[in-house]
UniProtKB/Swiss-Prot annotation:
Name of the gene this protein is made from: rplK
SUPFAM superfamilies named in the record: Ribosomal L11/L12e N-terminal domain, Ribosomal protein L11, C-terminal domain
Assembly: Part of the ribosomal stalk of the 50S ribosomal subunit. Interacts with L10 and the large rRNA to form the base of the stalk. L10 forms an elongated spine to which L12 dimers bind in a sequential fashion forming a multimeric L10(L12)X complex.
UniProt PTM: One or more lysine residues are methylated.
Organism: Dinoroseobacter shibae (strain DSM 16493 / NCIMB 14021 / DFL 12)
Domain of life, source organism: Bacteria
Keywords: Methylation, Ribonucleoprotein, Ribosomal protein, RNA-binding, rRNA-binding
Cellular component aspect of the GO annotation: cytosolic large ribosomal subunit
The protein's name: Large ribosomal subunit protein uL11
Example GO BP: translation
Similarity section: Belongs to the universal ribosomal protein uL11 family.
Job of this protein: Forms part of the ribosomal stalk which helps the ribosome interact with GTP-bound translation factors.
Pfam families for the chain: Ribosomal_L11, Ribosomal_L11_N
Length: 141
């Protein structure tokens, strides 16, 4: 017999750094999910990723208090900020540039994000990443 779905939730947790403190603990606890079990499973799955990289995670939880999780790749903005060596995007992106990235770096980011992007090929994924860069005030050369 199939498990009865109780709901889904989305969290953004740093890779390898899930712990029961807020915001993870309360978000899971109020839905009846075993917090320590989630933290151990999440940290085990993300141990090969860069520590501290924000990982969007979709958690599907069931009425029997079990859960499954899908860990996605870090946001394109995270990769772009890292490639451009900036702390944050521009406050006025159309008028201000905070850094530059090369087309090769954009391609590398698009390849890393490909499984989570809504694109058919690498060129489409690059356009999505270019749009993110433009909206952050990062120039592509």
């Amino acid at each position: 017999m199939a498990k009865k779905l109780a709901g889904t939730m989305k969290l953004q947790v740093p890779a390898g750094q899930a712990n029961p403190s807020p915001p993870v603990g309360p978000a899971l606890g109020q839905r009846g999910i075993n917090i320590m079990e989630f933290c151990k499973a999440f940290n085990a799955k993300t141990q090969d990723m860069e520590p501290g990289a924000p990982c969007p995670t979709v958690i599907t939880y069931y009425q029997d208090k079990s859960f499954t999780m899908e860990i996605k790749t870090p946001p394109a903005a995270y990769y772009l900020k890292k490639a451009a060596k900036v702390k944050s995007g521009a406050s006025t992106p159309s008028r201000q540039t905070v850094g530059t990235v090369t087309v090769a770096q954009v391609r590398e980011i698009a390849e890393a994000k490909m499984r989570d992007l809504n694109a058919n090929d690498i060129e489409g994924a690059m356009k999505i990443v270019l749009g993110s860069a433009r909206s952050m005030g990062i120039e592509v050369k």
